[in-house]
From Swiss-Prot:
One of its GO terms (cellular component) is cytosolic large ribosomal subunit. This is Large ribosomal subunit protein uL1. Keywords: Repressor, Ribonucleoprotein, Ribosomal protein, RNA-binding, rRNA-binding, Translation regulation, tRNA-binding. It comes from Campylobacter lari (strain RM2100 / D67 / ATCC BAA-1060). InterPro entries: Ribosom_uL1_bac-type, Ribosomal_uL1, Ribosomal_uL1-like, Ribosomal_uL1/biogenesis, Ribosomal_uL1_3-a/b-sand, Ribosomal_uL1_CS.
Length: 233
């Protein structure tokens, strides 16, 4: 048995596989699973009762986690003139227009989030095939296509999490670091679940959240009580 397999097996003993955990106990339990040599991320996974092949059942949006994500985020902004100045003053790491698009075309993407003003989306479209697969394409639904670039930069720097359901109806997100307090993780988790519930498509039928789990980067997952999640609004 490898060292990693043995570690994973030991962690499984701390989880009741027949139980659906309420948020408070789920958080306190995953905190006991920290075993890596780095500050692991607390991750939530949701299986939604939607069929994203239909446009009216797509779940996509963003939420600013009240206690942040614990990650340093590099933000790039495609803007000109006064809007470029606003972005710089708000703390954007990279600001440009044609020059920034040229760098992206060369494969130089030293940023985690890309924001653009609506009038320059035609320019951004030139590199859409590069940005899209990396999840970096600006989008109005995540607040990254906007004239309020200062607010968008602040959101990105202060814990904005973008979410989008995949083809199987799954959504994954990081809720912060395991070093966060119980209260911080609970606040972040509640905010994220509220956002998911808020984005429930009108066309979605039946039980919206089919199942859910919580884990750390390097830990097994535990099942969450979906009724509590559905009631978090």
């Amino acid at each position: 048995m490898s060292k990693n397999t043995k570690r994973f097996t030991e962690l499984l003993k701390k989880i009741d596989s027949n139980k659906n955990y309420l948020m408070d106990e789920a958080i306190s339990t995953v905190k006991t699973l920290a075993s890596a040599k780095f500050d692991e991320t607390v991750e939530i996974a949701l299986k939604l009762n939607v069929d994203p092949r239909h446009a009216d059942q797509m779940v996509r949006g963003s939420v600013v986690l009240p206690c942040g994500t614990g990650k340093k985020v590099r933000v790039a902004v495609i803007a000109k003139d006064a809007k470029a100045d606003e972005a710089k003053n708000a703390g954007a790491d990279i600001v440009g227009s044609d020059d920034l698009v040229e760098e992206i075309q060369k494969g130089n993407m030293n940023f985690d989030v890309l924001i653009a003003t609506p009038n320059l989306m035609g320019l951004v479209g030139k590199v859409g095939r590069i940005l899209g697969p990396k999840g970096l394409m600006p989008n109005p639904k995540t607040g990254t296509v906007t004239m309020d670039v200062a607010q968008a930069v602040n959101n990105a720097k202060n814990g904005q999490v973008n979410f989008r359901v995949d083809k199987q109806g799954n959504i994954h997100a990081g809720l912060g670091k395991v070093s966060f307090t119980q209260e911080q993780l609970k606040e972040n988790m509640s905010a994220f679940v509220k956002a998911i519930n808020k984005h429930k498509p009108a066309a979605a039928k039946g039980r919206y959240i089919k199942n859910a789990s919580l884990s750390l980067t390097m830990s097994p997952s535990l099942s969450l009580d979906t009724q509590e999640l559905l009631d978090t609004k």
